Regions:
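Glycine-/small-residue-rich active-site loops that bind phosphorylated ligands and cofactors
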Residues: 25, 49, 80
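A general structural motif
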Residues: 13, 68-70
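Local sequence-structure signature of Cys/Sec-based thiol-disulfide redox active-site neighborhoods
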Residues: 2-41
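Conserved N-terminal glycine/acidic-rich loop preference
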Residues: 34-35, 40, 80-91
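Thioredoxin-like thiol-disulfide oxidoreductase module
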Residues: 46-68, 86, 94
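A short, hydrophobic beta-strand/beta-hairpin element that forms part of a small beta-sheet core
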Residues: 70-80
Length: 95
């Protein structure tokens, strides 16, 4: 079976998940950077979630991010807390 360039690119793309706040400047900035670089990602705006779900998420987040800083960028199961552009780009292989 022959694959197209797009199929190959999609296979190489890392799994990216963001935990963000809808009002967070740096959260928006990381989304724009990922969009500009052409990466697919999923995100959750915690402040827009129902209270019970948000509290459950925050209890998990506190385990590795006690200050509850945002954004949280998870690339292939590696969590980067805060907007650390250079580190994010290193993990994405674009630096």
């Amino acid at each position: 079976m022959k694959t197209t360039q797009d199929d190959e690119t999609k296979k190489k793309q890392p799994v990216i998940r963001l935990v963000t706040l809808s009002t967070c400047f740096f959260c928006s900035k990381v989304k724009r950077m990922l969009d500009k670089e052409g990466f697919d990602y999923t995100y959750t705006d915690l402040d827009l979630m129902p209270e019970e779900e948000r509290d459950a998420q925050l209890s998990q987040i506190k385990k590795f991010n006690p200050e509850e800083s945002f954004p949280i960028v998870i690339i292939n199961n590696i969590a980067i807390v805060g907007y650390q552009e250079e580190r994010i780009k290193q993990e994405l292989g674009i630096l």
